């Protein structure tokens, strides 16, 4: 990291004064045109160059007076005394607004001074004239400035979220997942769900690197230290949902053990999306071998540059639409469904290409039994994709997610009965290639066995139907049979009173379930609290998955040393920075530093 330069009073001879950022960084600001430069420009050669080139090296005011004059951003009246109009507030606002858009679009910080500002100056000169261009020139948009602005906006957004967490009438829900970036650095990302103004809000919390290792204790320490750093008690967390895909975040991991030890009341849930990857564990040997053959074929094509180029040229030559395959080692199961569909639809062309390359994969790939297994797998994972897609949204709670899983599993017996009768309607790819009764017999037996194993797996892993009968009033307090509630249940009176209100019935019919119960906090606090404790926990790590997609935009080869947290927060947070407060605080801080 480069050493920060410091202001010297002798620099006033070039008609510059000093501005100080929130972090203490000093930057030179021209009194004559209000331009703010980076800390790296805080040296005589740079300041003299600007003074001579932009202002002709002549200024008609007393330097001794200038030494005691604050920066233009601090006292506009002082500048007016020197005949210089101050636009610092609007310049700062423009600078912050651009930095905000830069982060939202996930652009490099240098895009402002290298591309946007030069283009804007040219446009201003052509369309509006030199006066407009001169005003636009004063907007500070250097790399350092944009970086500083984003940091400040990130801290303001974080402060808003922390204030909301402290004010939430109910313990918050946490969503936690881990991924590895392009530098093989493990990144831990967290989102939070809390109640604010009669609705459940989901917000980005943090994205931090795991510096030493990826053990459960390291994850827990990072998680705990975030709350300690911001002076929030850890027991504000009522639930935590993990991706469940790795040992450190799995059901029996160290992380879960440490969390439960520190917060005994916490509800731990596991993502109902990612564990679908475990479906592969239920595949019989022949089906698993077929899947691994697909993996090897794609890696043969995509994993070797010459093969990949030849593959693209081959498909262009024969005029086939699909010419790009995803890199397919141990893929996420969601991609697996899409890939298997593409492989099945391109089967003949891929087979020709393997023959063309004299690959030893040909024998397994063109086997008739393999193609039948491929068709079944493509159909099966397409169904799984549709299930996953139905749960990939914000606001998904564990009750709704488990209902979708339960509905999916209930289809299995119908599929099994149809398959036993050689009816493959639910598996269109398979139906397309089954041409003889003998082929239908052997695959029907395999499928019915696998669907039974899959059904057992879903019931065991996802605990389908967790909501007991006595708690189903949460889903519909008006149609629910109140006799199911025990007479000693203190909230039975509240339920009876709530059901008698026509206005509340109208609210129930027009509002989302979570928002409805949030709205009842004032009139029926016990009912609302009980209902929301069940609806609050995250059901998936979908938000983290979206966050990881943003991480890929930020962490590129040209920005591999980039500190992610602040930019990601500004980019994906729903909150908008309080620009007026940030600018006012900045001006006050600069004034005090003089």
Curated annotation (Swiss-Prot):
Origin superkingdom: Eukaryota
GO cellular component assignments: nucleoplasm
Further comment: May be derived from an ancient transposon that has lost its ability to translocate. Exhibits a close evolutionary relationship with ZBED5, but does not contain any zinc finger.
Name of the protein: Protein FAM200C
Provenance organism: Homo sapiens
């Amino acid at each position: 990291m480069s050493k920060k330069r410091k202001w010297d009073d002798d620099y006033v001879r070039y008609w510059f004064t000093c501005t100080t950022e929130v972090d203490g960084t000093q930057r030179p600001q021209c009194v004559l045109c209000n331009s703010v430069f980076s800390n790296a420009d805080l040296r005589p050669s740079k300041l003299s160059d600007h003074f001579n080139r932009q202002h002709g090296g002549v200024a008609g005011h007393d330097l001794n007076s200038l030494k005691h004059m604050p920066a233009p951003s601090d006292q506009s009246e002082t500048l007016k005394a020197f005949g210089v109009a101050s636009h610092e507030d609007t310049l700062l606002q423009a600078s912050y607004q651009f930095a905000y858009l830069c982060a939202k679009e996930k652009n490099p910080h240098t895009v402002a001074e290298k591309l946007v500002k030069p283009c804007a100056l040219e446009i201003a000169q052509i369309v509006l004239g030199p006066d407009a261009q001169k005003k636009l020139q004063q907007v500070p948009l250097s790399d350092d400035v944009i970086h500083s602005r984003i940091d400040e906006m990130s801290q303001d957004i974080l402060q808003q979220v922390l204030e909301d967490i402290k004010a939430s009438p109910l313990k918050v829900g946490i969503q936690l997942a881990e991924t590895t970036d392009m530098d093989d650095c493990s990144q831990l990302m967290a989102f939070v769900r809390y109640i604010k103004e009669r609705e459940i809000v989901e917000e980005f919390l943090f994205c931090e690197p795991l510096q030493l290792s990826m053990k459960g204790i390291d994850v827990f320490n990072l998680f705990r230290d975030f709350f300690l750093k911001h002076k929030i008690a850890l027991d504000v967390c009522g639930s935590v949902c993990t991706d469940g895909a790795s040992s450190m975040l799995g059901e029996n991991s160290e992380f879960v053990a440490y969390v439960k030890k520190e917060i005994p009341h916490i509800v731990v849930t596991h993502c109902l999306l990612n564990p679908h990857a475990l479906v592969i564990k239920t595949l019989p040997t022949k089906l698993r071998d077929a899947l691994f053959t697909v993996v090897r074929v794609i890696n043969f094509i995509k994993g070797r540059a010459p093969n990949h180029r030849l593959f693209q040229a081959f498909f262009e030559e024969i005029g086939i639409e699909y010419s790009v395959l995803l890199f397919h080692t141990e893929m996420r199961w969601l991609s697996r469904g899409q890939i298997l569909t593409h492989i099945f639809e391109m089967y003949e062309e891929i087979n020709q290409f393997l023959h063309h390359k004299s690959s030893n994969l040909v024998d397994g790939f063109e086997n008739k039994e393999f193609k039948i297994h491929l068709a079944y797998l493509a159909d099966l994972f397409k169904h799984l994709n549709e299930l996953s897609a139905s749960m990939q949204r914000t606001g998904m709670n564990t009750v709704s997610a488990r209902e979708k899983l339960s509905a999916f599993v209930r289809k299995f017996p119908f599929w099994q009965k149809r398959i036993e009768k050689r009816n493959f309607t639910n598996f269109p790819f398979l139906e397309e290639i089954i041409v003889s009764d003998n082929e239908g017999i052997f695959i029907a037996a395999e499928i019915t066995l696998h669907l039974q194993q899959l059904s057992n797996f879903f019931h065991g892993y996802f605990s389908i139907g967790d909501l007991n009968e006595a708690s189903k009033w949460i889903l519909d307090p008006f149609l629910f049979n109140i006799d199911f509630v025990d007479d000693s249940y203190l909230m039975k009176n509240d339920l009876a009173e709530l059901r008698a209100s026509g206005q509340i019935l109208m609210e129930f019919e027009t509002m989302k379930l979570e928002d409805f119960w949030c709205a009842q906090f004032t009139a029926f606090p016990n009912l609302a609290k009980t209902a929301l404790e069940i609806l609050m926990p995250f059901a998936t790590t979908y938000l983290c998955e979206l966050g990881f997609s943003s991480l890929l935009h930020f962490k590129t080869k040209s920005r591999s040393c980039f500190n992610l947290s602040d930019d990601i927060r500004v980019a994906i947070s729903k909150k908008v920075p309080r620009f007026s407060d940030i600018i006012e605080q900045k001006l006050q801080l600069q004034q005090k530093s003089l």
